[in-house]
Amino acid sequence: MKVLITGGAGFVGTNLTIELLKIGHDVKIIDDLSTGLEQNVPKDAELIMASILDLEKLHKAAKNSDVIVHLGARGSVPRSIKDPVATHNVNSTGTLNVLEAARANESHYIFSSSSSVYGSNKALPKNENMVLRPLTPYAASKMSGEALSLSYSNSFALSVSTFRFFNIFGPWQRPDHEYAAVIPKWISKCLAGDEIEIFGNGEQTRDFTYVTTVVQVIVNCISNKVLHPEPVNLAYGNNISLNQVVGLLKNTFPTLKVKYLTPRNGDVLHSENDPGLLKRLYPDITVDEFENSLQDTIDWFKNLP
């Protein structure tokens, strides 16, 4: 199949591209490289350096696509608080643009939303029927993308699959970006012998999901055309506190030091998914233990040139 990945030069996109090429799909990527890296794009994938806000280049890239995986977004909660308009433009208007491209080509459209849409809803574990209470412009923009995707399924019979990503980590994730995720940032600090920082007391929990697991689910969704326009939470209920992550890192970096800082505005205290729907739709997915996945990620970073 011909697959277009928006944001395909990013972390999840790179891992997904590698796997799709391995099993014989044709992959095209559109990415403005604002956070993605050109050198991460496999040579057998075609890269179009453009924003999803560029309608002409987007529609050209999407032409004849069987599947469009929409990963492109302006990520990060703090970044959205700093510039909410830019976040809205890319994540809401940009998503509308990608939906139009999918509709024009009758593509299977796969959308990546975020668990941040639950926001101030403190009930745990999260399930897909809970009330959404976004705390930040980023979360609101992802909620908007979900609604748009569902509306295109209902209004235009577009084949839609929507996932809510939780805290994904693994190889190819950038540690050096201003808004880098916690695990790659911490591993990079550990390798450099620097102390790591935690906003809050470290007892906040996250349902970390290894990127290989996410890729398995998306590939399964593509191969079997699993349609579910209502969002599906993509995490397996393996929540762990940041202090527990630190404890595991100390197995490899015993001299690791931690500095605790004031909590950040907009950060959710606890995140844990109820994977019931995910397991029913994707029963054959293999989920690695967090400790093993974390060690694999450390080893990957250690082997970087």
Where do the model's predicted regions map?
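Structural element of the ATP-grasp superfamily
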Residues: 98, 149, 186, 278-279
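Short secondary-structure boundary/capping segments
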Residues: 38-39, 78, 123, 187-188, ...
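Hydrophobic (often cysteine-bearing) scaffold residues that line and stabilize catalytic clefts
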Residues: 13, 141, 179, 242, ...
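C-terminal substrate-binding subdomain of Rossmann-fold SDR/epimerase-dehydratase oxidoreductases
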Residues: 191-305
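NAD(P)-dependent short-chain dehydrogenase/reductase
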Residues: 123, 150-206, 211-220, 247-252
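Short, conserved catalytic or interaction motifs in soluble domains
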Residues: 35, 171, 236
